[in-house]
Amino acid sequence: QFQRYLSGLIISENKTVEGINKLFVIESRNQSSLNRLLTASPFSEEALNQQRLALLNSLSGTQVKPKGVLSVDDTLLTHYGRHFDEIAYLRDTVNGGYKWAHNLVNLHYSDDQTDYPLHFRLWRPADLDKIEQGLQALGIPLREGKFALKESNPKKWRQYLLGVWSRNQGKPGVAALYQSKLWIARDMLQTWVNQDPEWKLPVTFDSWYTQPAFCRFLDKELGLPYVGTLTSNDQVTLPEGRVTLEQFANELKQKHLDTVASGGKPILHKIGIPYKGEKETYYSYCRTHRIHNYGKQRLVINFNESDLCDSPSFYNSNRLIWQSVGITRIRRHRW
């Protein structure tokens, strides 16, 4: 039955139990047999995943390599109905709008030969009643004036309650009340380090996961290098004061264009990185700066076009001697 299910996931457009079962017309069985595999069979998903990873690591094309990269992200699994456990009405940042979906958090492995997930876990919507009761039981006070928001503005109540949870999540018992996507990512990375301590692969992620506490966890607790993604509103500290990265990039761009026009040495340098057998070109600035809330970081600002007419990308890393080529190559492996 497991072979039938796996084959169906690979080749069937309809990945329901009924749809997969209908594929097997020669050796047909009642779909209840396949359903029992998923609902009543005692197999361990974690043990199955470890066997999958062991198989991948036994093959030269898919084994973990010294230049491999780990990336953290989450994926929406869209549904066209609402009657599913753990489903939520979530914003689709790729296609826009909101959709009913499950949200799968992924720890992914990538190198120039292969890509595959290492670990994955379903994010579950916050149980606000559980969090409220749990915080009070742990002696963490909730402001009396906020309780009216339950009826008048449920969205603000949710934001307030999760804010209290977030600020206190380092205290005993608080983290267990709710597993945010960041906490799931932390747990998967901790599992990876525990299972494969010899590997110190860099971790990369988008701007949603680039948060100070998560970066400190990777640096101080796991000892892993990381490449994050900053936004144009993040701030860099310069001798003359703190400015946004957008302002800083605009200043660099103008200085670069003026210098090049007068025959001087360019401020942004042309770099090339290998990716999946191809070579990609960027125009890059790389220096160590103090980034607000992150401390001292290696900052990379990349443009795609030689005339710098496009919007720049901003990357940060805890490896202060790394150069823009290495940082950009690592970030490129976030699929």
Name these PLM-found stretches.
Residues L6, T39-E151, P274, H289:
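Active-site-proximal, Lys/Arg-enriched surface segment
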